Amino acid sequence: MNIKFDMFVKDSNSIDSEELLNNYLTLNVVSQELLIQNAQKPLTPLSIEIGKTRTINKNIKSKLNFIMPSFCEYYELEGNYILYFKKLKIFEDFIIYKDQSIPISNQMEIKIGKGKVLVNGKKISIKDEEIKNNFIRDLNFLSSIKNFRNQYSHGNEIEAVESISKKENSINSLVIPTFIKFLGEIIIKTKDTIKFKNLMVLSDNFNILDDVIYQVENNELNLKNSKNSVVYKSIKKSIPIYLLSKVFEHTEFYILEKNNSILNFFCKKRIEDFNENSEDKEFNSTSENDSHESSIDLKCSSEVSQIKIERFHEYVSLFSKCISKNVDINHKNDKGDTALHNTIKNLKKESGPMVAALLSCGANANIRNNKHKVPLHFAIEFGDESIIKILLAFGAKPFLEDSISFSERDPGKIYKELNKSGQVLKILYEIGVITKLFDNFSVLQHVKTFILLEILFQNSMNILKSDIFSSILNNIFNQNIVRFKLIIQNLKEPPLSKFKKIEKFDRSELGKLIGKGANGKVYELHYNFGGVEKHCAVKEIKVDKYRVGAVLKEIESTALSQSPFTVGIYGYFEDEKNNFLYIFLEYCPNGNLFDIINKEKMKSFDEFFSYAFGVVHCTHDIHSNPKGALIHRDIKASNFLVDKNNLVKIGDFGTARFDCTLNLSSLKNGAGTVCFQAPEASRGKATIQSDIYSLGVVLFELCGAIPYKNYNYFFPFGDLKYLRVASAVSNYLRPILHPVIPQPLSDLIYSMLNHNEYDRPTSFEVFQKLKKVQEDYESNKEEWNSIFNTIDMKEDQQFHHERQEKVALMIKKKYLLTRPITESLVNHYDNIVFNIDYSISLNF
């Protein structure tokens, strides 16, 4: 029993484009305009019979019945069918006639009779004379280009297509085979294929057909009892879907696509790894603007020069054809991605030739998708310096302020990707600049340095025109001059690659004493580490032999988190005989921040922001450690050191813990300086947000250090040194800033001192807000800086006197408070424990 399909196509002017899109098998693949374009002229209703198939799925039948007439016609030929395409081209080597394949060869015997055609002795009955003539013409044409398939399968698609297009009688109708004897094998191997709705995916899965065809042609594959087998039935069910997939895969349908999704798929599919089996070649391509190509002049590092010139030119040619057919090469899909986004995202390091071709044909390198990512984001995320160079050469902007995080992805996976991304990242990892690309702040801060360092280390500045390179430097200077100085310094003095145990050391080698604290003494020393001389600060600690392991573990945790924002730890020496431990640290000659803000008088808020951004950078840096966020638990001004370049670094990780559930119990042990502890930390539950509270106290200190006119109180409650505590925790009191402090800054600090840890901003949010505060300052510098000269001494003293009275009143009522606000009040009382009545709620 034959199944008949009665189909027709309406006039293109009357096509219901909405209905076409709603019913189309691959919804987001073809635009309305394209469907209308392909349905050109009204067709007479035609009848199709598909062999003796009885098992065609009704759903498939309806879809086939609907979609195929939009760009091809059907004709019945004795239980078989022929598709006559209007514009599309497809090339196969078989005709199926009554379940038998008729191979098309260079020497094909075709006999024409009245209403009959004999092909290699097999009869085909054709009643319509016009159909018969078209059929014969196509057979002759196919036999004359038998070498097409070999040409096509060896990567010469363009030559193959051009060889056909040059023929006088170009094909407009071709016979489509069903491949009955071997298609079933493919269905079995890709048994889930028929479940897919996207023809592009189907097309990919059918690529294996080339190998199977070869086996059939060489009699290497035989299917016994095929008509009654599961394979045979699977074939029959799959034919309509298979035909559709082949139409998409091998035709010019790609470059007719208006909404760019097929172009994106082409970019994904037609690529060859430019590093694989290729010799180094320089490539140049210059063409007129009319052809939508811009000049390429990339004579640079080997990574770029490995791009195959042949493939590059082929892609340029293909994309030029796309543009000539009004395809928008910068069109966005529903995710906002362009062809350039998808090429880099899907192909990663294999995308070189395609990226260069897209850019040379006018692709915009600075278009953002719906997640605000530009192509440069993906190139950096996948760590491919070659693609970064290509993008930069075509005008990709290296500053990415509006970038978002990679937080939707597993940070561990991204970290592994970064570790596999080549020599540049290895260098950056040693320096510690680019180890955390997966979080917001790191993308903002490290993208620029990644590009700069990559260029500097590879000595490839010639890749960029001077104006582009100048733009990079200007943006880096304007946006983060502190970090840029730090990077340059690291380039001059590369740090030691690993924290290690020092085998030989004599205490007599120590230089002058430069510091002393409750935990030990600090000496200056110049020490040679395997040929690298370092100016060190050596911390001498008296350690009980039973605690050495625990102390070393803490030191190791610090070493693991080393970056340009942490005081470097070069190594340690254990004096087992005298129970001393010597920690070799980076020397910071400008001392700690506490001493600086006590001894020096700030003249403007420029100095405040310089230090404020420094402490925020440092805090965020340890919070975004790739091995797990590191909770410092003892953030205070004296633990921020300032190096010879006036860059702020964080040190003293003696109480630090990595933030993970396995270590939660270790965070319950009280540690840190009492006056800087957050409410929850004082209860033995330290979190990352506890560090934010302490950071807020440091910013508070920076504000308190502003020398108002005749102002002698460098810190809040500065004259009440007998108090061991000056602010409450939880829902008690919090520090009070002087009212002269500008509102944007005081709002930020108060948000960091929120009694509820979950309402405090993250370190990155602190950075963002501080940047906005700085912008407010930049636009009102005169007003902000005027507070240095406008505070009257009486008014200033009255403000502090009122605060003193309130504190004294609280003491009188026996409301025990938990912490003084400044280090100066508890320099010698770091280990004092206070009893706190948390049932009492106090407010000013």
UniProtKB/Swiss-Prot annotation:
ANK repeats: 335-367, 371-400
Annotated PANTHER family: MITOGEN-ACTIVATED PROTEIN KINASE KINASE KINASE 20, SERINE/THREONINE-PROTEIN KINASE TNNI3K-RELATED
GO biological process, alphabetically ordered: signal transduction
Family annotation (InterPro entries): Ankyrin_rpt, Ankyrin_rpt-contain_sf, Kinase-like_dom_sf, Prot_kinase_dom, Protein_kinase_ATP_BS, Ser/Thr_kinase_AS, Ser/Thr_Kinases-Pseudokinases
Molecular function per GO: ATP binding; protein kinase activity; protein serine kinase activity; protein serine/threonine kinase activity
Keyword entries, A-Z: ANK repeat, ATP-binding, Kinase, Nucleotide-binding, Repeat, Serine/threonine-protein kinase, Transferase
EC id: 2.7.11.1
Xref: PROSITE patterns: ANK_REP_REGION, ANK_REPEAT, PROTEIN_KINASE_ATP, PROTEIN_KINASE_DOM, PROTEIN_KINASE_ST
Signal peptide: none
Catalytic activity: L-seryl-[protein] + ATP = O-phospho-L-seryl-[protein] + ADP + H(+); L-threonyl-[protein] + ATP = O-phospho-L-threonyl-[protein] + ADP + H(+)
Enzyme class: transferase
Protein name: Probable serine/threonine-protein kinase DDB_G0267566
Domain Protein kinase as annotated: residue spans: 508-773
Ligand binding (ATP): I514, G515, K516, G517, A518, N519, G520, K521, V522, K539
Similarity comment: Belongs to the protein kinase superfamily. Ser/Thr protein kinase family.
One CC-aspect GO term: cytoplasm
Active site, renumbered: D634
